[in-house]
Amino acid sequence: MLGVIRNKTIRPSFSAFRFFSSAKQMTVRDALNSALDVEMSADSKVFLMGEEVGEYQGAYKVTKGLLEKYGPERVLDTPITEAGFTGIGVGAAYYGLKPVVEFMTFNFSMQAIDHIINSAAKSNYMSAGQISVPIVFRGLNGDAAGVGAQHSHCYASWYGSCPGLKVLVPHSAEDARGLLKAAIRDPDPVVFLENELLYGESFPVSAEVLDSSFWLPIGKAKIEREGKDVTITAFSKMVGFALKAAEILEKEGISAEVINLRSIRPLDRPTINASVRKTNRLVTVEEGFPQHGVGAEICTSVIEESFGYLDATVERIGGADVPMPYAGNLERLVVPHVEDIVRAAKRACHRSVPLAAAA
């Protein structure tokens, strides 16, 4: 099968971005789809595999149209066996191909953790750089509204702690398109964490983003909003929450700088610390568990590198330390909200926050 993939003749390809060239908005779903299309058209070694990525066009339609365009040799529907198809993907990467492996949810990646960690992540180091593993693991991560604990785990800090992996967390259409293209081109294994609730959201995109040559550097954060009073770091869905919080804070005289991390590993420590040295305050936001989280790592970096610049205690916002409830009213109680970010930023700026509200 791999020989067939390697020698497959690419069909003439339309440029995925042309469909959007006259538009100013693009959904995250379309951004991911177009990134896959452009990279598959440019490199015959790139192929997709996973549950329902072909005939069904992806559980969330991210791979729509790609089976028809590139054929079953490059868009492979797999059985429901994450350990099996992930192992095949890693083996294909050893062989020199560039698989993009989709998990219907990253909760299911636990079935394939041995291949992801012990094979993909460690092989380059253990071979003294002789073996590259150019593979992308992508799919849903975190809160997806009403799907329960076994479909809502946030794996950002989990995979972010593992040497040998790169971990990307897109928020906007620009992020999704540019980071996925970079991930596919990267010689190392990349974990690409998407959020279901962002798929249908539209974001403004420039002509540069729509160009087929566009990509984003891995490990570089983006300052989404400049400010002078407090730094707020966030990733994935939480970036939107942070921006909404910044708008509310502005009305109360607080200027918040919002950093979209984009990458968890490597983490853009210079951008974060430069911002904190300007604002002298820090609030980290994530939806994952509070212990050993991404926010904890960011706070540690700031304490180690910029402690003398801090005018207030660092603030961490995260999910509750419990598995995700199924009931909607309980789910709302364990995930962060805009008002949580606002209260934390006001505390950091020494503004009055009632004890009941701060609890």
Curated annotation (Swiss-Prot):
Pfam families: Transket_pyr (PF02779), Transketolase_C (PF02780). Keywords: Metal-binding, Mitochondrion, Oxidoreductase, Potassium, Pyruvate, Thiamine pyrophosphate, Transit peptide. The keyword Oxidoreductase applies. GO terms for cellular component: mitochondrial matrix. CDD domains: TPP_PYR_E1-PDHc-beta_like (cd07036). Its cofactor is thiamine diphosphate. Gene3D superfamilies: 3.40.50.920, 3.40.50.970. InterPro entries: PDHB_mito-type, THDP-binding, Transketo_C/PFOR_II, Transketolase-like_Pyr-bd, Transketolase_C. It comes from the Eukaryota. It is found in: Mitochondrion matrix. The pyruvate dehydrogenase complex catalyzes the overall conversion of pyruvate to acetyl-CoA and CO(2). It contains multiple copies of three enzymatic components: pyruvate dehydrogenase (E1), dihydrolipoamide acetyltransferase (E2) and lipoamide dehydrogenase (E3). NCBIfam families: PRK09212.1 (NF006667), PRK11892.1 (NF008854). This is Pyruvate dehydrogenase E1 component subunit beta, mitochondrial. It comes from Pisum sativum (Garden pea).
